[in-house]
């Protein structure tokens, strides 16, 4: 991450995105499920920001497991699952005043607000705690759930009822259904008392109030939660049967009327400069607060504008978190490990003696590639004044972002005698194949391909992962066990092997039930979990295949566009890419690449995947065992445009082009940029030209912008 993203080559960007996706996912699990973060929030934010920056510059390289489309982490198995009626999204981050100005300008452009139009924003401290959603029906608390992965959380209702800040019954005139979102936290004074008590009882102390709050709320013993003096600030909402307010601030005040505690520092401002001043005011005064904060959150105050702005994959367009600066610390570099990714990339990871930076325990840091270790940048320029990194060094670690921390320098004066330069392996540690670094690349890659167990195992892990086939009982350790099994009736080397496991076992004398870590009950549950996935939504199926650049979002786009697998496969097998500048490719190619978000790079990756004989063989075997189901509608049945392909052309007056496309997609339609026989509707603005003419020739339904808005409004959307 030392190199400016703008100067990255496509290959360098691809390698770094691979590392970011894996590390961010690992730390999401540590933070959300185990309450044991290894890095600071600032470091976590920096990595997420780096990921978004690279994806923005290289949209064609967005990965199937991109953290940009994920919120939180898959939930643990300690609590029952609770599905959020509305997704609990995360927030994009700002790290400077310039970022805040850009955010406000971005909002104005999306809404087409003139400079003279005032844009009110709320500002509030960003509480460093555990996000919680509280569902009330007829004024009574019926469910409390953690964020989880943003869509499904942990049901902690019994524990939440012990918090004095959470009303069991709402006060005043409240909606029939109300989901309140907020943050569970622990005051500094209560945190200190808790750790004193832990020490006296000979128990482990907590690293910081956030960990203590999260661990306390997720206790299996409710009495333990009740003793921990947890607090709750309400700041938002999810599903509401009837909105009682027109602005963010008005709604927050309503929450107070209902009986919730709101942060008294929440304010409304009309100018960006006032937001920045408020940020510095809070930053300077944070030491006097009795709870942890890690920034300031800005939100568009007008709820109608919030609705128009909508959301992107993992965050709302109408809010942003302005984070406080990073912190630094010295750490001892104990070792350097080499990890092998699904695509064969060799990634060095620093193992550090545990240190605490800003209350967060740090044990790992990325070393990016061999040049970075040598003290060289992406263009072979000197970094860190040429100081290389060696095992045994004392290094400067900066917490400023996402997944693992960043090593920014080496303390040469503390280098032990005899410390030798690190020799990057030229052979893959997993399979012994040559690790080749091609010209212009920063990363070495294993050439073992399918014979490399590390790569093959990662592919299977991806296939069974939470957002793909989501097969319970096939975690990392189990996948490794089955992959390395000596008995062929236990071996899993391809996706189809998963679904033939039970049949092979029925004819075997080597019983899985007798293996260490398994038993009759666990094996039965595993088979049930596997058989439950023999029918799966098309989007999950496509994502599970691991086609480069086809992440969760693109998989959903493809599934929505083609509805069934046969239609998708036909296009993937018959699409012909342009062979020269004059050639535009055949109709299937144009159809594929005209899907919103699916461009030339993604289309090429899909075609390349299906042209590979091995991939077709794997798919053929897999399709004998599983059935991809037509994609379910992403919106309610009453959406007038659900499932339709819409093209917008000409100049639109009331909404920006981005806004109408985003609205169409939220309503279950596919926004396309080109007219074809499969187009259902053309919305024509002022000055519509050739697309309007072609639509008339093809007999496609046409309406103007006013009719489009009327259609939407008639259905209360």
UniProtKB/Swiss-Prot annotation:
Membrane-spanning intervals of the chain: none
Gene3D superfamilies (alphabetical): 5' to 3' exonuclease, C-terminal subdomain, 6.20.10.30, BRCT domain, DNA ligase/mRNA capping enzyme, Helix hairpin bin, Nucleic acid-binding proteins
Binding residues annotated for Zn(2+), in chain numbering: 428, 431, 446, 452
Catalysed conversion reaction: NAD(+) + (deoxyribonucleotide)n-3'-hydroxyl + 5'-phospho-(deoxyribonucleotide)m = (deoxyribonucleotide)n+m + AMP + beta-nicotinamide D-nucleotide
Binding, NAD(+): 41-45, 90-91, 124, 147, 183, 299, 323
Entry's Gene Ontology BP terms: DNA repair; DNA replication
InterPro entries registered for this protein in UniProt: BRCT_dom, BRCT_dom_sf, DisA/LigA_HHH, DNA_ligase, DNA_ligase_AS, DNA_ligase_CS, DNAligase_adenylation, DNAligase_N
Cofactor(s) the protein requires to work: Mg(2+); Mn(2+)
GO MF annotation list: DNA ligase (NAD+) activity; metal ion binding
Keyword Protease: no
Family: Belongs to the NAD-dependent DNA ligase family. LigA subfamily.
NCBIfam families, alphabetized: dnlj, PRK07956.1
PANTHER family: CHROMOSOME TRANSMISSION FIDELITY FACTOR 18, DNA LIGASE
Name of this protein: DNA ligase
Origin species: Bartonella bacilliformis (strain ATCC 35685 / KC583 / Herrer 020/F12,63)
């Amino acid at each position: 991450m030392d190199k400016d993203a703008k100067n990255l080559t496509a290959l360098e960007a691809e390698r770094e995105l691979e590392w970011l996706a894996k590390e961010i996912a690992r730390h999401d699990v540590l933070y959300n499920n185990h309450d044991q973060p290894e890095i600071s929030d600032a470091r976590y934010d920096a990595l997420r920001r780096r990921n978004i920056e690279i994806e923005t510059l290289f949209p064609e390289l967005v990965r199937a497991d991109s953290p940009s489309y994920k919120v939180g982490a898959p939930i643990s198995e300690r609590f029952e699952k609770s599905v959020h009626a509305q997704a609990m999204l995360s927030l994009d981050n700002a790290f400077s005043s310039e970022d805040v100005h850009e955010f406000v300008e971005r909002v104005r452009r999306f809404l087409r607000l003139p400079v003279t139009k005032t844009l009110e924003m709320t500002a509030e401290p960003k509480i460093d705690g555990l996000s919680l959603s509280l569902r009330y029906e007829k004024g009574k608390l019926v469910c409390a759930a953690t964020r989880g992965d943003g869509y499904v959380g942990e049901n902690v209702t019994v524990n939440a009822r012990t918090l004095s800040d959470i009303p069991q019954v709402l006060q005043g005139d409240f909606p029939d259904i109300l989901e309140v979102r907020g943050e569970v936290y622990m005051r500094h004074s209560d945190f200190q008392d808790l750790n004193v008590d832990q020490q006296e009882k000979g128990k482990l102390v907590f690293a910081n109030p956030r960990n203590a709050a999260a661990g306390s709320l997720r206790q299996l013993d409710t009495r333990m939660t009740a003793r921990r003096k947890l607090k709750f600030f309400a700041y938002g909402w999810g599903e509401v049967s009837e909105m009682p307010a027109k602005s963010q601030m008005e709604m927050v005040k309503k929450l107070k009327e209902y009986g919730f505690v709101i942060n008294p520092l929440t304010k409304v401002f009309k100018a960006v400069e006032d937001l920045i001043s408020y940020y510095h005011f809070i930053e300077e005064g944070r030491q006097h607060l009795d709870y942890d904060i890690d920034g300031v959150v800005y939100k568009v105050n007008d709820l109608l504008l919030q609705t128009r702005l909508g959301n992107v994959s993992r965050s709302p367009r109408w809010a942003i978190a302005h984070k406080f600066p990073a912190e630094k610390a010295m750490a001892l570099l104990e070792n350097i490990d080499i990890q092998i990714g699904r695509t064969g990339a060799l990634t060095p990871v620093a193992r550090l003696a545990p240190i605490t930076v800003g209350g967060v325990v740090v044990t790992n840091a990325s070393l990016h590639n061999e040049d970075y270790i040598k003290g060289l940048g992406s263009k072979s320029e000197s970094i860190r004044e040429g100081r290389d990194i060696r095992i045994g060094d004392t290094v400067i670690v900066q917490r400023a972002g996402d997944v693992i921390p960043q090593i920014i320098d080496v303390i040469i004066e503390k280098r032990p005698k005899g410390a030798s330069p690190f020799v990057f392996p030229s052979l893959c540690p997993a399979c012994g194949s040559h690790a080749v670094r091609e010209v212009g690349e920063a990363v070495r890659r294993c050439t073992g391909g399918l014979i490399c167990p590390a790569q093959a195992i990662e592919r299977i892990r991806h296939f069974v992962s939470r957002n793909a086939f989501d097969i319970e009982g096939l975690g990392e350790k189990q996948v490794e066990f089955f992959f390395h099994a000596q008995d062929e009736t236990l071996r899993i080397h391809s996706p189809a092997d998963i679904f033939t496991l039970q049949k092979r076992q029925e004819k075997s004398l080597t019983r899985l039930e007798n293996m260490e870590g398994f038993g009759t009950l666990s094996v039965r549950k595993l088979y049930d979990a596997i058989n439950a996935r023999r029918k799966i939504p098309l989007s999950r199926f496509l994502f599970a295949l691991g086609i480069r650049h086809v992440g969760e979002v693109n998989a959903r786009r493809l599934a929505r566009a083609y509805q069934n697998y046969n239609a998708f496969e036909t296009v993937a097998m018959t699409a012909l890419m342009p062979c020269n500048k004059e050639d535009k490719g055949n109709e299937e190619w144009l159809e594929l690449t005209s899907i919103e978000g699916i461009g030339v790079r993604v289309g090429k990756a899909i075609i390349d995947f299906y042209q590979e004989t091995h991939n077709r063989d794997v798919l053929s075997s897999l399709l004998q065992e599983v059935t991809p189901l037509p994609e379910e509608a992403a919106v309610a049945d009453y959406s007038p445009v659900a499932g339709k392909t819409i093209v917008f052309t000409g100049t639109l007056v009331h909404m920006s082009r981005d806004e109408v496309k985003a609205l169409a997609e939220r309503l279950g339609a596919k926004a396309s940029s080109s007219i074809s026989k499969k187009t259902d509707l053309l919305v024509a603005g002022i000055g519509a030209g050739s697309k309007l003419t072609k639509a008339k020739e093809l007999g496609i339904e046409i309406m103007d912008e006013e009719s489009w808005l009327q259609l939407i409004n008639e259905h209360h959307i």
